[in-house]
Amino acid sequence: METLLSPSTLLSPLRGSKKKPASPAASASSSSSSPARSVVSCALRRQQPPPQAVAAWRGDGGRGGGVGSWATFLQHGLAAAALSLAISMAPAPAPAVASEFDVLNGGPPEDTYVVDDAGVLSRVTKSDVKRLVRDLESRKNIRINFITVRKLTSKADAFEYADQVLEKWYPTVEEGNNKGIVVLVTSQKEGAITGGPAFVQAVGDEILDSTVSENLPVLATDEKYNEAIYTTAKRLAAAIDGLPDPGGPTFKDNKRESNFKTKEETEEKRGQFTLVVGGLLVIAFVVPMAQYYAYISKK
């Protein structure tokens, strides 16, 4: 095997030797041995492991590319870990919040009478308002819708937005004649009431002005949104039914007692303090002098 694959025998002849013409037997033997030589050479090449395979499992630097393979592997692992951590710590997308335009395009509520876009009303308040205005509509044929929004971007105040809602929901005078709209803007702490001619006449300007100036803004300032909506509904329903006005919200006198003393109390305390200090000074001078006088008298 070594004789067949030796470089000296395969590549160059011996020095000083002359090339002789090959005999037919030698040519035949040479031609017959060359295929075997090529087969053995190919077999030996197949047995050598490729350098890529060695570099793939060696990490000690014994073969070329081992250290680089481990470094690349660590870089990919760290990048994947960082990406996973960033995804896990990313805040969840906030749920979509309806806007004033969604309220306009949504149309009037068919059965609830309340569009709580601001999300400040409880289920109890919605149920009480629904029961109150549904009974009012069945008896007086006057419908009142209540709307709460967080803020306004298209209109300057709640009154313009209320008029816009009335025109959008009830385009004709016949449709909006007996309809009322109550709007409460939580961020601006203000409210507005508008409606068709029949609604305004049934409620009266005095109750409308009083409700807008007392119930809605005052209670909204204290973030009592449920009370603001429900008391407004009660006052409007009472006015339409011709009942006595329940009135606006009652205010408690939360006057706090001051910790500061009045002028009279200060003068009185000052006189007492002067008397005490003067007495202590007299005692401090008189007692030692009396003791000294008694001591001298004994001598």
Swiss-Prot record:
Pfam families: TPM_phosphatase. Residues 252-265 have a biased composition (Basic and acidic residues). InterPro entries: TPM_dom. Residues 1-60, 244-265 are annotated as: Disordered. This is UPF0603 protein OsI_019212, chloroplastic. Gene3D superfamilies: 3.10.310.50. The chain crosses the membrane at residues 276-296. It comes from the Eukaryota.
